[in-house]
Regions:
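Nucleotide-activated chemistry modules centered on ATP-dependent adenylation/adenylyltransferase
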Residues: 1-243
Length: 243
């Protein structure tokens, strides 16, 4: 009979306690913000706790204007610097040259390639020099995230630790915190969006749909991930070469 699995680090602790622990444990800590509700909560918690953490966000070049507006609102509200990371211009040029402006509509492979160029590679570069990063991923967001640990080895970025303080929180808990503390939130939520990414790859959802149903809605694939939060269980096959 095998040994029982070790207890999950910081499991059951409050998000604030997790963030304070991470801040004391990892001298070089980043908060990677999508500017969705969850990262807004984390930024607010960090501010209230006096946690000095570098806030990073990805500008893919295809974001809606409302996301740029949200970046400005966060800067103004918390008086912090938000480091905006952009993809490598040569990589984007090659992607567009070989596959067109909107390749993501043609196949899941090309969509994942676009996400890799515009999101995964830039994040990998931005995280160089850090020990750990905070993310707003929650287990209830999608079946692909149901096993999210509060603290885990980052398999995508060897040597880094990935910390998800809100892993056990529900959507209702997120929004209760936002309303209680008057946290600024992305304006597209008021227009029926429940998950917000790039403009051409995101739509509003209808009542009863999953939170991430508005992401890449034309795909039949159940794995609605861009690549920033792959796990061994939800990782797709390697991207096929397209002529």
């Amino acid at each position: 009979m095998g040994s029982p699995a070790p207890p999950e680090i910081m499991s059951g602790e409050s998000p604030e306690a997790v963030m304070l622990w991470a801040h004391s444990k990892f001298p070089r800590l980043a908060l990677v913000a999508s500017l969705q509700a969850e990262s807004s909560v984390l930024i607010d918690m960090a501010s209230r706790a006096g946690i000095g953490v570098r806030v990073i966000t990805l500008d893919t070049g295809r974001l809606p204007q409302e996301t740029h507006d949200m970046i400005d609102r966060v800067r103004d509200r918390y008086r912090i610097s938000v480091d905006v990371i952009v993809p490598d211009a040569a990589d984007v040029k090659q992607l567009v040259h070989e596959h067109g402006t909107n390749p993501f509509y043609r196949s899941p492979d090309l969509r994942r390639l676009c996400c890799e160029v515009r999101k995964s590679r830039p994040l990998a570069g931005a995280l160089i020099g850090f020990d750990a990063w905070l993310t707003g991923v929650r287990r209830q967001q999608a079946s692909t995230r149901s096993e999210t640990q509060v603290v885990a080895e980052d398999l995508e970025h060897p040597g880094l630790t990935k910390v998800a303080p809100l892993a056990a929180w529900s959507k209702d808990q997120v929004w209760s915190y936002i309303h209680e503390h008057d946290v600024p939130y992305h304006s597209l939520y008021d227009r029926g969006y429940t998950s917000i990414g790039c403009a051409p790859c995101t739509r509003a959802t209808s009542a009863g749909e999953d939170e991430r149903a508005g992401r890449w809605w034309w795909e039949n694939d159940e794995v609605k991930e861009c690549g920033l939060h792959w796990t061994p269980d939800n990782r797709p096959l390697p991207i096929a070469h397209h002529e």
